[in-house]
Amino acid sequence: MFSVRYKAIALSALLLLFGCLCGCEKGSGAYIFKAAIVGNPKTLDPQTALADSSANIIYNTFRGLFGYDTEGNIVPDMAESYSVSGDGLEWTFTLRGGVYWYADDFSAKCTADDFVFAFRRLINPAVKSAGAADFFVLKNAEKINKGTMTDLSLLGVEAVNETTLKITLEYPDSDLPVLLASSAAMPCNEEFFETTEGRYGLSADCVASNGAFYVHTWSYDEWSEDSNYFILRRNTLNVPPDDESIPVGMNFFIDAKEACSDFCDGTFGAYITDSAEEISELSGKYTYNTYETAVWGLVFNPKRFSDAQLRLKFAEKCTFSDSDCYRSAWRITPPFNYGEKNSASLSADDIEMPASVNVVMPQNMELREQMNAVAQEWRTSFGISCSVFEPETQTYEQRLQSGDYDIALVRISGTNSSKYAYLSAFLSNSPRNFTGQNSKKFDHILDSAKKEQNEAIRESYYSEAESFLLESGLFAPVCSQTDYVFFGKKSQGMCYNPYLGAYIAIK
């Protein structure tokens, strides 16, 4: 999932990664970029969107204060320039002129008021944005979001004039630009928002764009396999028709069944896979990059596995073997297999075992084989019945959200390479926290890390937080995942961001 936390990024690590991630060849933009995406987004409202698939649309149709350049550096975008006060609490932004909103029958200049309205929506408890807590660094944001303060105008975001925005913080945060490059920090035009009458972000005609493209068509029918797609076309108010640095449009196909063959015949401009068979077939023919940005691990039902020793006992007997796309992992934060493997202290063998265990995992052939081998190990070692289930994607996600599992295999990825980006998945208020347990101790450790200005002390907090999860068996890492991204001829001007899981057109 995406758009949950963007703090405390290690800039040097980001530069090293992005230095080789771009398939950005400049050339004729007189083409339409086409690619497959996984899953239909529930919304394109930047303040509430979570799905990876929405990132492909949002990051090409919206411009925030900060964005990414072709090397992956976080750079000013809508912010033409900015200054920071001596105490680090006030950030003042001068916005670019000549940037416009566009939707059918609507156009308007993008101004500082659009950012104020967006941040107020984000923090407003009535909106119930899962990303609100990430922005508690804004003055009064936490009080407003938790209901102890009700006046939204007291939020530390102010439009000084049409082109000047002032943001006031609760505490200094030198990594604020990383946060402001996130989806949740994208602007929102209040006038257009009101015209959607509660349907903002839910259909193509309920999305206004201040970016290079706008949503022309959003077609989705859950009973159809070939009518599910997005069509983005150039927002000519922001990018001239004769600008050839980026495509003239984009088509994203939702859950395309023949994505690999569509890439091979030149229909798609890029293709992502973790299939060993496809990698072997494509690697000698196309340019590609690899990204190890996700870790898979086990989470346990909090009722059936309330005993930490029981969780650790099962985790101890769970070992995945290495392959091209999956490597054994024992850490939650990257690098996932760095240093010594954690050896948790186990009690005597008198732990009461459940008679049977059901494991839920997403559909994945290679991981299925690994998980079945682990299930057999549990049967042999513990003398229990163990079954592995692979429901459809939507059912799998529903079971995770409702806690309908004994053990679940889940994927954790960060929105950047920082430790916070991964560990924040286990915060009590995180929609990615599938452990079913809310730990005030863990929340306090991460909150301390977030506010700590000393890098060494901050790192010690992160180590403490990760050790807490591992030693209590709340999350048991089993393997990291490497994605292969192949680029075809029709990908000029496009870059791939592995943390956002998105193809982005960058001038």
Please identify what each model-predicted range represents.
Residues A30-G39, E90-F93, F115-A118, L165-K166, ...:
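Short, well-ordered beta-strand elements
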Residues A36-G86, A208, Y499:
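N-terminal lobe/hinge region of extracytoplasmic solute-binding protein
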Residues S81-D134, S306:
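Aromatic- and charge-enriched surface segment that lines or borders ligand/interaction sites
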Residues D113-F115, E162-K166, D265, E292-P334, ...:
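Alpha-helical secondary-structure segments
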Residues L152-S153, E162-T163, T168-S245, K257:
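Gly/Pro-rich hinge or "lid" segments in bacterial periplasmic/extracellular proteins
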Residues S224-S227, I351-G414:
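Ligand/substrate-recognition segments at binding pockets and active sites
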Residues I231-S280:
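Ligand-site clamp/hinge motif
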Residues A315-K341, E366-A375, L400-K507:
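Detector for C-terminal structural segments
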